[in-house]
Amino acid sequence: MGRGPVQLRRIENKINRQVTFSKRRNGLLKKAHEISVLCDADVALIVFSTKGKLYEFSSHSSMEGILERYQRYSFDERAVLEPNTEDQENWGDEYGILKSKLDALQKSQRQLLGEQLDTLTIKELQQLEHQLEYSLKHIRSKKNQLLFESISELQKKEKSLKNQNNVLQKLMETEKEKNNAIINTNREEQNGATPSTSSPTPVTAPDPIPTTNNSQSQPRGSGESEAQPSPAQAGNSKLPPWMLRTSHT
């Protein structure tokens, strides 16, 4: 038969109680050391005997470091799990204040839109009227300011466009002058290469063809100048020889 569960209760015998405490204490310290080494855990063990004697073990360099870490963790844990009741009460009061302010603002907005005016007195209506006039004046002032700024910006753009237009116009005039200069230069070069107009070269008549006419082969008399050919002979100089022989016969 297996053993049943051991019932834990206080040892009445003082000596047995001290012996058991000593054994269990050493075993507990040993187990704490083993878990700190095997599992790389931070372990802190504090034991007080019945006589108030302190026995402790710390895997950290100091027991105080582990205790401070424990206190920080415990405080943060309590802050999350146990919210402050005073803060809750303050939140409730603040919610009521904010809600009343919101209701007042919504009511004022509706009155500015001309709604829910039945409950207002004459004085309240006058105040509302002054408020609307002030708002309208402020709106008009802001509108005029924006219009002036817009006009000023447009004037600046207009001035900039005019300057750009002037620059482009000057560039076009410069290019036009360059083109005209190139055209004039080309014309002058063409005129210089063309020969000047001169009188036509006279066409010389070919030399007369010699004939077998006996009259032309006779010697001239001494002292007699050579006779000039008649116009008919000059004209006949261009005729073929056989025509010349026929004419002389």
Swiss-Prot record:
Keywords, ordered alphabetically: Activator, Developmental protein, Differentiation, DNA-binding, Flowering, Nucleus, Transcription, Transcription regulation
Polar residues bias spans: 210-236
Record keyword Nucleus present: yes
Annotated K-box domain residues: 88-179
Compartment(s) of residence: Nucleus
Annotated Pfam families: K-box (PF01486), SRF-TF (PF00319)
This protein's GO CC annotations: nucleus
Annotated tissue distribution: Widely expressed. Transcripts accumulate to higher levels in organs that retain meristematic characteristics: in the apical meristem and in the meristematic leaf primordia formed on its flank; in the developing panicle at the early stage of rachis-branch primordia differentiation; in the procambium of the rachis branches and in all floral organ primordia.
Molecular function (Gene Ontology), one example: protein dimerization activity
Residue ranges constituting the MADS-box domain according to the UniProt record: 1-61
Biological process according to GO: cell differentiation; flower development; positive regulation of transcription by RNA polymerase II; regulation of transcription by RNA polymerase II
CDD domains: MADS_MEF2_like
Remarks, miscellaneous: Plants overexpressing MADS18 remain very small in size and flower at 105 days after germination compared to wild-type plants which flower at 140 days after germination.
Subunit text: Heterodimer or heterotrimer. Interacts with the K-box of MADS6. Also able to interact directly with MADS7, MADS8 and MADS47. The dimer composed of MADS18 and MADS6 forms a ternary complex with histone fold protein NF-YB1.
The protein's name in its UniProt record: MADS-box transcription factor 18
Taxonomic classification: Eukaryota, Viridiplantae, Streptophyta, Embryophyta, Tracheophyta
